[in-house]
Amino acid sequence: MASQVSQMPSSSPLSSNKDEIRPKADFQPSIWGDFFLNCPDKNIDAGTEKRHQQLKEEVRKMIVAPMANSTQKLAFIDSVQRLGVSYHFTKEIEDELENIYHNNNDAENDLYTTSLRFRLLREHGYNVSCDVFNKFKDEQGNFKSSVTSDVQGLLELYQASYLRVHGEDILDEAISFTTNHLSLAVSSLDHPLSEEVSHALKQSIRRGLPRVEARHYLSVYQDIESHNKALLEFAKIDFNMLQFLHRKELSEICRWWKDLDFQRKLPYARDRVVEGYFWISGVYFEPQYSLGRKMLTKVIAMASIVDDTYDSYATYEELIPYTNAIERWDIKCIDELPEYMKPSYKALLDVYKEMEQLVAEHGRQYRVEYAKNAMIRLAQSYLVEARWTLQNYKPSFEEFKANALPTCGYAMLAITSFVGMGDIVTPETFKWAANDPKIIQASTIICRFMDDVAEHKFKHRREDDCSAIECYMEEYGVSAQEAYDVFNKHVESAWKDVNQEFQKPTEMPTEVLNRSLNLARVMDVLYREGDGYTYVGKAAKGGITSLLIEPIAL
């Protein structure tokens, strides 16, 4: 187990006032009520499943079939990916892209094809040089004015630029250049290109949640005159089949949550189990990860309760035995806790006990020990923040960052996400993850800094809480906006680290790395306009509605 810190001496006396005023939190109740308790009665009928299989084979054949040129091949693969069905054809797509990588045709060198090829190959780990874009610059080093009329090319360059890594100045310039010209052009474009551009300016492919983006692109793709009818029909059926599976999972989780009765027992805590499931379905949506999704949703739900206990209700005196109990991970510790803490402590241990039972048949109990240790470290970091708040202590920015990165919970979620994966995860995977590799560091920075900006900018943090933005402003004598800009630069740098870690050869299989990529994507979607989890913003409501409530008309 992780080393104990709950008895660590503090630098100043701590209050022992039994009547200490508790932190105030006033979270809105769940906007979903009991809506997801029951799964829709209508199952996928046998005829639809048979049609799904027929279309799947048709699409598979089209992926591997020769096409007139690489542009057509790239565009078809891109459509398969953006419609959310590429998980069915992983090997076929990889083989086709490897062939394209080794057989580049310079004759197809327009901006659209160059950018699309660059993006798809980068997405799959190929180290394509950004020098391929130099031919679109003039002698002064600026992008040629002639490319501004090629909206499709600009859009692809814009999307490709989000795959950039450190030192690729031309792609940093491309983001600004394409954003400016696409923003100017969008109002004069015809549908569906206008919708593609408008949506892209709000959400890039690289940083969007695959299922949310697939749901949106389905509505765009069907309006493209040259769309492939078999692919479109397959994607629609596949979306509805996945939606039904996800609804069944969420119904099961909601029943578990309702039985815990935390709304009554812990009224200070956020009731966000539906949003938690949406978060985790962003981490992995594929059918083979059903068990992992359910386990990880329960973990994020309990982590949210633990967070609110530290941050929104418990006194520091109560948090000492609470942290100690989590460190010891023993149900016997429950007798040392205040009455209101007992239900959540028992539920926390029960979630991990169930996890152990579920993975035991495959001899994977060792994975749960890593997951427990990650949760313990999270609780220890929460205790440090609670001590700072009690003492009204303002740490330096670097001191704050060292503790705040673990408190965002992303290292814990990344490690725990591996528990529910198959044989691709090994003991070496957990040893690697426990050593804080760059991609987990990067996704954690994205989470922490986006959360900090959102909480401060949209006033989502209590006045007595220690704020990273306030620490930075005070230490460096800058305005709030200047601090936001610095934090956002850290986020952009972290995204470059994420992209770098996908370039072959990689430390870990892509499926392992995808967990951290998708965790970062969740933050980009939910926290760009405030804390979309706690305050259930437009992105969360829209995503949950489109992915879990509204089926696609066939």
UniProtKB/Swiss-Prot annotation:
Mg(2+) 3 binds at residues 451, 455. Mg(2+) 2 binds at residues 307, 311. It catalyses: (2E,6E)-farnesyl diphosphate = (1S,8aR)-delta-cadinene + diphosphate. Keywords: Lyase, Magnesium, Metal-binding. SUPFAM superfamilies: Terpenoid cyclases/Protein prenyltransferases (SSF48239), Terpenoid synthases (SSF48576). Responsible for the cyclization of trans,trans-farnesyl diphosphate (FPP) to (+)-delta cadinene. Its cofactor is Mg(2+). Residues 1-16 have a biased composition (Low complexity). InterPro entries: Isoprenoid_synthase_dom_sf (IPR008949), Terpene_cyclase-like_1_C (IPR034741), Terpene_cyclase_plant_C1 (IPR044814), Terpene_synth_N (IPR001906), Terpene_synth_N_sf (IPR036965), Terpene_synthase-like (IPR050148), Terpene_synthase_metal-bd (IPR005630), Terpenoid_cyclase/PrenylTrfase (IPR008930). GO terms for molecular function: (+)-delta-cadinene synthase activity; magnesium ion binding. Its EC number is 4.2.3.13. It comes from Gossypium arboreum. Residues 1-21 are annotated as: Disordered. This is (+)-delta-cadinene synthase isozyme C2. Belongs to the terpene synthase family.
